[in-house]
């Protein structure tokens, strides 16, 4: 095990991620969401491996470059390589550097703790900052969206991505408020939402779901997940593993569906769905390492409340397609511990 400089950033479910990824010497891995570098440090510390890391946030790239410098000082070599961009573009980004196959991929979905804590990024309604919400430094901001989007479209993204039942009411209030003055800060938007969405016994701030919906739209987060999962699975060599940590039901649903498809665990044929009545399906190339999503323990949740909603799923590319676990045989493959 290597000695890697430590960081104050504590990634969610780190022990479980490492157990599922099972880093080994000489292998090549990808951290598709570098963020604070917590997973990257742990992977590099667990084995003498090479790690490529992607993030679209310039601040994350700077943190990665600082870690590169620390590693050079500590080891005299270069095992960490940083790439700026979205993980949904991982194949193209890696191909430009001559990388076409990986032994493992880790994805930590959603907004990072650093982004939430940096007031000027405009992700949080708990502090007043500019209404930005971009994970990168290009594209429309949240302020652009809430001040220009039509009421119906605004309601749709808040409902679909934020799962806010009162989305129509929220959109109407936003449109009425912006007619008086532009909405430019997180406090402004949060107050508008709270004026029409009552609190409930859960203690969740009434602005939470609407902020989530707008943020997901601004960053095309679900689109990134769909393409990122597809590309990650395609890049994995036999024995390669994909480990994904998600934080809300929309993310977890996409991950579950993608991994189940890869492992051949799709619903059986139905006479009500002609598309399902196919005579034969190709043997799956993957097996699930998690029959259901893993969740953080209570100790971790007490130490880091943001971990409470985390879900981890993982899969491994098989050396030989599994002819015993076709689409028409939905028996779960026996889990093996890494």
UniProtKB/Swiss-Prot annotation:
Domain of life: Bacteria
Top EC class, one word: transferase
UniProt biased composition (Polar residues): 322-338
Record-linked InterPro entries: RsmH, SAM-dep_MeTrfase_MraW_recog, SAM-dependent_MTases_sf
Location within or outside the cell: Cytoplasm
Single GO BP term: rRNA base methylation
Recorded catalytic activity of this chain's protein: cytidine(1402) in 16S rRNA + S-adenosyl-L-methionine = N(4)-methylcytidine(1402) in 16S rRNA + S-adenosyl-L-homocysteine + H(+)
Residues holding S-adenosyl-L-methionine: 37-39, 55, 87, 108, 115
Any one annotated GO CC term: cytoplasm
Protein name, per record: Ribosomal RNA small subunit methyltransferase H
Species of origin: Gluconacetobacter diazotrophicus (strain ATCC 49037 / DSM 5601 / CCUG 37298 / CIP 103539 / LMG 7603 / PAl5)
Gene field: rsmH
